[in-house]
Amino acid sequence: MTSDINALKYKKVLLKVSGEALMGDKQFGHEYDVIKKIAGDIKEVIDLGVEVTIVVGGGNIYRGINAALVGMDRASADYIGMLATVINALTLQNVMESLNIYTRVLSAIPMMSVCEPYIRRKAKRHMEKKRVVIFAGGTGNPFCTTDSAAVLRAIEMNCDILLKATQVDGVYDSDPKKNPNAKKYFTISYKDVITNNLQVMDMAAIAVAQENKLPIRIFSIKDQGNFAKVIQDKGKYTTIEE
């Protein structure tokens, strides 16, 4: 696929991929056919001429907040969750490189034997060389979600927009899986997301995005080719902005 990059509204984007998206219909781990599809969708966007960076979650392997609820120390549980994001980042890297996408994994928790440490200037240099940077390890701090990491990295990398790939095709006023009459928003303000406590993203992440005027677009990763459509203002999605 070819495109005039100057015609695209968003030329540099950060894609947030949840750990759950990588496990497909499984209850745990990875579904490689699903990961290959996601990698193919990413390649389609790269072929448009868009610079893509990625933040991955770790919920398909470990959720720190859930472990804390059953008595585990929250900080320790969150660190284990950060390790899960590194596993996911390395998995996604390998699948993407099988499609000839040049990729680097940078972790907020240094693991010199398996990936590079996160250094902002190094990440930007990789992007200048047309490599896809996958950010792992969350923010490197406990009590912070990978949603917060995605917002921070998008701002640090001067991305035009953050796209969150989820299991639903946008933001609803209630859970569409439980309420068939749930209302979907095409656009919604940061303030309304926070005021109505819409559980589409961590509220701290929404607040930082609002302060830095970073638009967020929520879409479904299940639909083949939807990433490229959403980049071009097509397909199904919800945009969160002022």
Swiss-Prot record:
Keywords: ATP-binding, Cytoplasm, Kinase, Nucleotide-binding, Pyrimidine biosynthesis, Transferase
GO molecular function: ATP binding; UMP kinase activity
A Pfam match: AA_kinase
Residue positions binding ATP: K16, V17, S18, G19, G59, R63, T166, Q167, Y172, D175
Role: Catalyzes the reversible phosphorylation of UMP to UDP.
Principal cellular location given in the protein's record: cytoplasm
Subunit structure: Homohexamer.
Keyword set includes Transmembrane helix: no
Species assigned in the record: Rickettsia canadensis (strain McKiel)
Residue positions binding UMP: G58, D78, T139, G140, N141, P142, F143, C144, T145, T146
GO biological process: 'de novo' CTP biosynthetic process; UDP biosynthetic process
Reactions listed under catalytic activity: UMP + ATP = UDP + ADP
Recorded family membership: Belongs to the UMP kinase family.
Pathway listed: Pyrimidine metabolism; CTP biosynthesis via de novo pathway; UDP from UMP (UMPK route): step 1/1
Activity regulation text: Inhibited by UTP.
Gene name of the record: pyrH
Localization: Cytoplasm
InterPro entries: AceGlu_kinase-like_sf, Asp/Glu/Uridylate_kinase, Uridylate_kinase, Uridylate_kinase_bac
Protein name: Uridylate kinase
EC number assigned by the record: 2.7.4.22
GO cellular component, one term: cytoplasm
